[in-house]
Amino acid sequence: MSTAQRRVQELEKLILHHQDRYYNAESDISDDAFDALWEELARLDPGNPLLKAIGSDSQRDAVKKRHIVPMGSQHKAADEESFSAWAKKNALQAFLVQHKLDGVSLELQYERGHFCCALTRGNGIVGDDVTANVRGMRGFVPTLTAEWGPCGNLPFTGGVRGEVIMHKDIHRSHYPTHANCRNTVNGILKRKDGRGRTHLHIVCYDAVPGTPGKPFTGSLPFADETEKLAWLARQGFVTVHSHRCANAQEVVALRSEIMRTRELLPYSIDGLVVKSTDLDFQDAQLPRPKKQIAFKFSTQEAITTLRDVQWQTSGVTYTPIGITDPVRLAGTTVKRANLCNPNMLTKLCLKIGSHVLISKRGEIIPKIEALVSTPAHAQEIHIPTQCTSCNTVLENSGSRLFCPNVNCPLLSHHRITRWIECLEIKHVGTELIQRLFEEKKVRRIPDLYTLTCEDLIEIEHVGNATAKKILEAIHHKKEIALQTFIAGFGIEGIGETMGEKLICAGFDTLEKVLHATTETLESIYQFGTELAKSVVTGIARVKDDMCELLDRGFVRILAKQQAESPLRGKSFCFSGSLRNGDRATIHRIRALGGVVRTSVTRDLSYLIFESLSQPYRTAQKLKKEQGVALEIISEDEFCRLLDQASASCTHTGETVHPLQGKSFYFSGASRSMNHKHAQEKVRALGGDVASSVTAQLDYLVFYSQSTRYRTACALGIQIISEETLHKLIATAQSPLHTDAHVHAPLHGMSFCFSGDLDGMTRAQAIALVQRLGGTVKTAVSTQLTYLVSNDPHGQSRKCQNAVRCGVRIISEHVFLALCTPGT
């Protein structure tokens, strides 16, 4: 038997097992994970009989009855490409889009207008009779009015289809120990005593005339799906939320909007049902109707195969990273997944070849969550026992695999890299650090400041000009905040955020930090005994290097904040993807004495929100349940707060230059100021003048479309005109108060791209728009500002939709001009 055949057999067993758990017990995997198993079976064995079967929710001792029309399943689309292919194949005139309710399917049968019985899906042909429980549910209608037949005066005989759901607030208050609403509904439906049935709602979406086995007999009082929903509503049924879309692009746009706001719904949905607006009786009787599809939300979980485990080093810590077969997850292709620590390998019983469930819930690297199955030929995972750098025997505490050697080269290298990252020293990349470290030119942080041009020129591909640029970048950062200084030494558990906590707790000078004890540190909020010990031990090991940096004048620690700093004592947390919530904003807050937090806690001052994300909901909960004095403000309110703080700084004489931390490259010949004069002004205002275009560049000052101009476009670097540079320089008279439109020239604009671009890829164009404050849409709608297309004839579907919607179509050249204000 081949490997593929063995996998097919394994998939059959898994699917049958999870179908039974789904309908008759607590489901032990997510819908996304089950769909992944189904799709894998369809790929390996398209003709497998199991793919044509329908799962059963039947109980063996329940009374069985036949459906009026078989309850089939639906085709599924997990992404825009799959949905667009389905839409193109079926060429429907219009689309009816409905919430895909996450509940239990139900058929209510009526005879001459009177309720007879209620059936679950069962095996699709016959279902369990749950009549007694349904009578007590919300939304149940016992008698229908005489609105049937050619004259509209006959009582209805047939079935009404719907979904039994539970609202999320009911689930939270009455069934907190149950996994989810659907599992709870399934359990209540099958109770013989009817307990809990009043907590359930019936939401309807279909009506089928006829009798069991003889569907669609008799005339209809409606002509299409929209009129059907109206008829159901007139009868007193609660109907599913529906929306009519003219084309596939509108469906995609609607899905994106609902994905953003679905947490506000009182019930759970896991996608949308998209169907034809026309009635088609023959199609409705198919096991999987062709003219409707379940348009699922972006997959957050998937099943794949673990092929290898690589051990990634961060300092002296070894972290396992799982290498898997490629799988689509939340709109991206995933091949690497985090395994956290050796404990996870043991806990999940993982082996090379295991089928695993991975998730991606906002994390950059997806995480392996669970073991699905392990084939017989799977191999054990090798856990390293010796340090790859110093050959010291590694210590495995379960939660961490690490080298205990305090003089391990890995630790020294990590500290140097961390220092470069914290100080944001440009032009010193990981490859250069590695070469300097290997050639023993830099083995400690102070060694960076004793480098000479000759040292650097000896490194391959480093010339005299580059060497000077590197040295200038290293020595440019002279004054450093205390929390940055401490974080730069890579002490385990201490980044800038925890450094700020130290300062807020009274350790606001290096001398106080150096003399801190475990007992004094463990009393600080979010510091425990272990972290306190780690900090004290780590500080002791790097104390000499810290003192050398300061004693030799390589760097200086900024004087501690004065009490009059306008944001002193205030802390901020950002929720969602703010258009201005970038690194420059964080620097601006810190320059004014404020603190930036990564999570919502009791002592937070402000939450700046753009969307109803998890931090927003946590903040609301803290305010409501614990009476926390936390202000939740919009981004516009936040900007006004910063402006007021900036004005306060101006009155007190405190200045923070608007070009601090910004880098510029000058392209072409200036019309009104020579390069040297412009560069002097930029440097005087705290900016940095770059000699080449790299991904780290902030601005390219545009005079002509040189090669470097095109390189900057491709890298997504903001391109500004000479006039815009004048505006930036002029803001020096009003420190920190910058014109939002200078930094975000596309603010308030939305763009959609059609076809290929000449000067950059679509991904680069999207990155450029987002960097300049604009938004990117995947479909054309009346809310769109511009459609970017190089099609001179406007024959694409997006161009045609733009014409119908009154959206302006612009070329790539005009698009680049918009990205370059002042030209």
From Swiss-Prot:
CC cofactor: Mg(2+); Mn(2+)
Active-site residues, record numbering mapped to chain: 100
Annotated Zn(2+) binding sites: 387, 390, 403, 408
One Gene Ontology molecular-function label: DNA binding
Residues reported in the UniProt entry to bind NAD(+): 31-35, 73-74, 121, 163, 275, 296
Pfam families in the cross-refs: BRCT, DNA_ligase_aden, DNA_ligase_OB, HHH_5
SMART domains per the UniProt record, alphabetical: BRCT, HhH1, LIGANc
Keywords per UniProt: DNA damage, DNA repair, DNA replication, Ligase, Magnesium, Manganese, Metal-binding, NAD, Repeat, Zinc
GO terms of biological process kind: DNA repair; DNA replication
EC annotation from Swiss-Prot or TrEMBL: 6.5.1.2
Entries under PROSITE patterns matching the protein: BRCT, DNA_LIGASE_N1
Keyword Cell inner membrane appears in the UniProt entry: no
Domain (BRCT) ranges: 562-655, 654-742, 741-823
Superkingdom of origin organism: Bacteria
Chemical reaction(s) catalysed: NAD(+) + (deoxyribonucleotide)n-3'-hydroxyl + 5'-phospho-(deoxyribonucleotide)m = (deoxyribonucleotide)n+m + AMP + beta-nicotinamide D-nucleotide
Principal EC category: ligase
Record function comment: DNA ligase that catalyzes the formation of phosphodiester linkages between 5'-phosphoryl and 3'-hydroxyl groups in double-stranded DNA using NAD as a coenzyme and as the energy source for the reaction. It is essential for DNA replication and repair of damaged DNA.
Family: Belongs to the NAD-dependent DNA ligase family. LigA subfamily.
Annotated NCBIfam families: dnlj
UniProt-listed HAMAP family: DNA_ligase_A (MF_01588)
Protein name: DNA ligase
Species assigned in the record: Treponema pallidum (strain Nichols)
Designated gene of the protein: ligA
